[in-house]
Design a protein with these regions (language model features):
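Membrane-water interface at the C-terminal end of transmembrane alpha helices
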Residues: 16-28, 121-137
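Short, Lys/Arg-rich, polar N-terminal cytosolic tail immediately upstream
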Residues: 1-15
């Protein structure tokens, strides 16, 4: 990682990083809850399991933690982490859509659309938190 002369790489302690990751999980889970409620109100099937809190909160936590691990690896090994995450994050979000498309039969367009939005919301909350507690430069 190259830094401008006089710049110092910012490193946060593990408790700060943990707090940021937990905050991202909470914020993303609340946003997911709003999306799930809106989708159910708009006609998504009531029995569509991915729109149940137990499902999306768990998967949100898994995604945010996995993203934090990936972010830490990118920070450590990439010569230009900003450039890498600029294409890597959107690519991974789009790839994460694939399993949701397989659920059209169960969730319909509204249910699956809500899931796709949830992926974007989780990624946005996570990247915001990672940039605060694990800056790339």
């Amino acid at each position: 990682m190259s830094l401008p002369s006089g710049a110092v790489a910012v490193r946060r302690g593990p408790l700060v990083v943990l707090g940021g990751v937990l905050a991202a999980i909470v914020v993303a889970s609340v946003a997911d809850a709003v999306l799930a409620l809106l989708a159910l109100a708009a006609g998504a099937p009531d029995d569509f399991e991915p729109l149940k809190a137990s499902s999306y909160i768990f998967l949100t936590a898994v995604g945010v933690v996995a993203g934090a691990v990936g972010w830490a690896i990118v920070r450590k090994v990439s010569k230009d982490p900003e450039a890498l995450v600029r294409w890597l994050v959107p690519t991974l979000v789009v790839v994460s859509f694939v399993p949701d498309f397989l659920l059209f039969g169960d969730g319909g367009a509204i249910g699956v659309g809500a899931l796709l939005l949830m992926h974007v919301v989780v990624a946005a909350a996570a990247v915001f938190a990672y940039r605060k507690v694990m800056p790339l430069s």
